[in-house]
Amino acid sequence: MKPAFNVRQQSEIFIGPLADILSGVLPEGRVVVVSDSTIDRLYHSVLAQYDTVLIGLGESVKTMQTVEMIYRRFIELGVDRSTFVLAVGGGIVTDVAGFAASTYMRGVKFGFVSTTLLGQVDASVGGKNGVNVDGYK
């Protein structure tokens, strides 16, 4: 599959069915998916082949506590520096998963499948990810 867009030679953007995108662009080796219950319900048949970390829904999960939960799950799954972390979801999922992946073991490779319009123009191509602390963004 060829990218539909190339953002600053750093991010490739693919458009199409999730199964086609994943089969055409994921790196060789181990992939762990970070997502939420809505995406899991809608795409379980596509994502079932990967180890998955599910987070809650909404802005309230964009916290260090969620990042710590992701770290614990990564440890349970044996995620190491050769693992590719794929965040599938909207901006909250990509922000939290991107932050967790970039800080776990001093950073593991990660990518996004952004499922919302806002996530597609903000969190997935902004080059930075983060969580809220004590209600501050």
Question: Which residues does each predicted region cover?
Answer:
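N-terminal cationic-hydrophobic initiation segments that often serve targeting/anchoring roles
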Residues: 78, 101-102
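ATP/NTP phosphate-donor binding region
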Residues: 1-84
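Buried hydrophobic packing segments
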Residues: 70, 97-101
